[in-house]
Amino acid sequence: MSGKTLTRMDLSEAVFREVGLSRNESSELVERVLQLMSDALVDGEQVKVSSFGTFSVRSKTARVGRNPKTGEEVPISPRRVLTFRPSHLMKDRVAAGNRS
């Protein structure tokens, strides 16, 4: 594992190089796409990216947890959590280490 993280700037730079938009337009495009995805998730919608995966929000109910150190019961409040489920193609690509 290389330890490198893909950032917004990296995505903008890739759009700049591959699509030919200006750097500002590339950055705005990436920001807009991420904003649309975020807004959809906040509204409880799923975000499906073909050949990549599905982002969704799950509602978890309140439950009783336990402090592993003391064994004391602790209430866990209800909350919404973000989940990602990779597509089969993405799983296969990652397993094979295929970059194309």
Swiss-Prot record:
Organism: Jannaschia sp. (strain CCS1)
Described purpose of this protein according to its UniProt entry: This protein is one of the two subunits of integration host factor, a specific DNA-binding protein that functions in genetic recombination as well as in transcriptional and translational control.
The keyword Transcription regulation is assigned to this record: yes
The keyword Transport is assigned to this record: no
Pfam families: Bac_DNA_binding
PROSITE patterns recorded: HISTONE_LIKE (PS00045)
HAMAP family reported in the protein's UniProt record: IHF_alpha
Keywords: DNA recombination, DNA-binding, Transcription, Transcription regulation, Translation regulation
GO molecular function terms listed in the Swiss-Prot or TrEMBL record: DNA binding; structural constituent of chromatin
Organism classification: Bacteria, Pseudomonadati, Pseudomonadota, Alphaproteobacteria, Rhodobacterales
Oligomeric form and interacting partners: Heterodimer of an alpha and a beta chain.
Protein name: Integration host factor subunit alpha
Family per record: Belongs to the bacterial histone-like protein family.
PANTHER family: DNA-BINDING PROTEIN HU, INTEGRATION HOST FACTOR SUBUNIT ALPHA
GO cellular component, one term: cytosol
Record GO biological process: DNA recombination; positive regulation of metabolic process; regulation of DNA-templated transcription; regulation of translation
